[in-house]
Amino acid sequence: MQAEKNNKLDWINNLIDSFRLKINDPYRKVDVVDVQQEARLSHLGIVPESKRFNTFLIDIGSGNTKGGFFPYGDLNTFRLFQLNWGTKSISNATEKRCENDNSLDNYNRQLSKVLGGAENTDIIYAVNSSGSYKLSDNIAVSGGAAWAVANLTHPEMTDNPIVPVTYKEVEKLFEKLYNNFDALAPTFLAQTITRSSEREQAIKNIKAVQKVFDQKSLMAGTGLLLKIMRQFASAYETKQFFLVKNGSVGWISAYVDQTVEN
């Protein structure tokens, strides 16, 4: 279990005891959701039932990436996908390599090396070993990086919880993040949106993204997303990529539904 690996069992047990005390029910059964269950529940909560068995879900977190898919056309087996890389861990590894040169140019050089290493040693193997390429027509990506990229590539889609993107669109965004960050200013990005209410919402969304992520962390998250997407971008077969804006609530909603059913 992930908590055991991180030596957090005592912390979790204390949290459960505190919860029982607060609700005045010392014998209440409290289930701990492990990484396998969380990834499975995320799939059930995020991916529409019509696309359940041909969609590979990937959640890019701050310290790691996880996800998976149902390989046999039923809910009995869920194949887990895991990477020990996330937006923050990529950024931290890059900054460590920068040493005393904190310039954007050096950050970009070191980021390229970190991402290249992650791709060659982890990402390619994780995708290939999952067997997801042949079985998945759709690649859905959730997490903070996906939320950020969705709002920056398609600010006009304010009411869409799921945003379709192409590899080229995300690649173009990365180039802007490095070479022309001013072009991603909220008012500039939203200027082509004609309806004022939608334009104001788009500006609000972009400001929220840039409040959470600075330029360098956006480069790290977008770069990691690109490396993952690259494994599914082929001249011979087209995969559909989707970015999920509110993926964090997915596994929770599925967990609640499952609990009610049981």
Walk through the language-model features, giving the residues of each.
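Helical "lid/coupling" subdomains associated with nucleotide-phosphate turnover
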Residues: 3-13, 17-54, 69-71, 77-262
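Short glycine-aspartate micro-motif
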Residues: 55-59
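Acidic, divalent-metal-coordinating active-site segment for phosphoryl/phosphodiester hydrolysis
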Residues: 63-67
